[in-house]
Amino acid sequence: MSQGIEFNRLMLDMRSMQMDAMAQPKSVAPAPELGQSSFADMLGQAINKVSDTQQASSQLANAFEIGKSGVDLTDVMVASQKASVSFQALTQVRNKLVQAYQDIMQMPV
């Protein structure tokens, strides 16, 4: 019986929050500027992250191969798959960028 009371109280609280949210005027605040990073900077950071992931995976695999204690095969495989997926995603981004560049270059002026 107490669960029903708690549920009803929860529903009443949710409805009151909904009414409060609907009653308040909505204003759109401009997004705070966080240093204006360029697309090239963001792409460079993504490439560095992929590189770091691959290096960490390689180091973990080497540690497992030499029999270092505390390194499990599952950890090695998960790290390897993370590196593989991140590299594949980066490759797809590169392919899309190349395709977009080619499309722009083929546009009539």
Curated annotation (Swiss-Prot):
GO cellular component, one term: bacterial-type flagellum basal body
Keywords assigned by UniProt, alphabetized: Bacterial flagellum
Keyword Mitochondrion: no
Pfam family, one: FliE
Annotated compartments: Bacterial flagellum basal body
GO annotation, biological process: bacterial-type flagellum-dependent cell motility
One example GO MF annotation: structural molecule activity
Superkingdom of this protein's organism: Bacteria
Family to which the UniProt record says this protein belongs: Belongs to the FliE family.
NCBIfam families: fliE
Name of the protein described by the UniProt record: Flagellar hook-basal body complex protein FliE
Organism: Pseudomonas fluorescens (strain SBW25)
